[in-house]
UniProtKB/Swiss-Prot annotation:
GO terms for molecular function: collagen binding. The keyword Hydrolase does not apply. It comes from Bos taurus (Bovine). SUPFAM superfamilies: L domain-like. This is Lumican. It comes from the Eukaryota. Its main location: secreted. Sulfated on tyrosine residue(s). Belongs to the small leucine-rich proteoglycan (SLRP) family. SLRP class II subfamily. GO terms for cellular component: extracellular matrix; extracellular space.
Length: 342
């Protein structure tokens, strides 16, 4: 166990110790293999002969979607000036699987008709860093991964029927809890949901119980309903850092979820350590107002087979010091690799 005193280096804290799963590990991205282009390609774009089903049209100052020839399955249109999508933009490529439109000028009113729902094989749709004010749709049932980050979204349309939708990225928007609650109820395959950097003051109701990863950091959440997380029987990774959580808004067993492996409550207003299940492995509580270390927050009882599985614990930026830690902490946290205190 490495128990030490660390200065509060904010630039270093922002994720240095985190073991959150890398979202991009879930996908094997086709890489941009620029070189000689396939003849079956839009003249302004690049379709590598070694990867003829991919068309790269990044950073070309395009104002509209170019002609997309049949056979293209992976289409990259990043960092352009595209401000509209016509209804027939993809009629030659109904087997398109990935459509990447990040860093353009798209608005909802200029995305015509059922341009996306016609793509019956589409699995990945990214429209990050655009000018959307609501989610796009209708969308095809084949969709697995939807990314709409860094827009101005305050309204979510219906996601009904999207039985394969597994990943949703909605961070850095203008969403409030009611907009989220109404939209996501029926997504039975959803495992990954990022709602960080929005405008929520409460936890949204009706989130799918299938979630494995839920990010709600950087909102204005101050209260957790009693047993809110109990129904998420598969939840493993939960972020609630940079909110307004205080002891009065956190019921005693809020985070006592047996499936939970990682919990981030850093940068809140907590004075006592919320109780967690013995299975939790990584717990981030830095920069709160914690006054003492209570072993019972980690171990209800102590014994040869009764101990916490905590590996990494962050307590720096609180009122807890190394000398104030109780002796039985070491027995409770016997498998910890790192405990960071002031």
């Amino acid at each position: 166990m490495n128990l030490g005193v660390f200065p509060l280096l904010l630039a270093l804290i922002g994720g240095a110790s985190s073991t959150y799963p890398d979202y991009y590990e879930y996908y094997d991205f086709p890489q941009a293999l620029y070189g000689r282009s396939s003849p079956n390609c839009a003249p302004e774009c690049n379709c590598p002969e070694s990867y003829p089903s991919a068309m790269y049209c990044d950073e070309l100052k395009l104002k509209s979607v170019p002609m997309v020839p049949p056979g293209i399955k992976y289409l990259y249109l990043r960092n352009n000036q595209i401000d509209h999508i016509d209804d027939k933009a993809f009629e030659n490529v109904t087997d398109l699987q990935w459509l990447i439109l990040d860093h353009n000028l798209l608005e909802n009113s200029k995305i015509k008709g059922k341009v996306f729902s016609k793509l019956k094989q589409l699995k990945k749709l990214h429209i990050n860093y655009n000018n959307l004010t609501e989610s796009v749709g209708p969308l095809p049932k084949s969709l697995v991964d939807l990314q709409l980050t860094n827009n101005k979204i305050s309204k979510l349309g219906s996601f009904d029927g999207l039985v394969n939708l597994t990943f949703i990225h909605l961070q850095h928007n203008q969403l409030k809890e009611d907009a989220v609650s109404a939209a996501l109820k029926g997504l039975k395959s959803l495992e990954y949901l990022d709602l960080s950097f929005n405008q929520m003051t409460k936890l949204p109701s009706g989130l799918p119980v299938s979630l494995l990863t839920l990010y709600l950091d950087n909102n204005k959440i101050s209260n957790i309903p009693d047993e809110y997380f109990k129904r998420f029987s598969a939840l493993q990774y939960l972020r609630l850092s940079h909110n307004e959580l205080a002891d009065s808004g956190v019921p005693g067993n809020s985070f006592n979820v047996s499936s939970l492996l990682e919990l981030d409550l850093s940068y809140n207003k907590l004075k006592s350590i919320p109780t967690v299940n013995e299975n939790l492995e990584n717990y981030y509580l830095e920069v709160n107002e914690l006054e003492k270390f209570d072993v019972k927050s980690f171990c209800k009882i102590l014994g040869p087979l009764s101990y916490s599985k905590i590996k990494h614990l962050r307590l720096d930026g609180n009122h807890i010091t190394q000398t104030s830690l109780p002796p039985d902490m070491y027995e409770c946290l016997r498998v910890a690799n790192e405990i960071t205190v002031n």
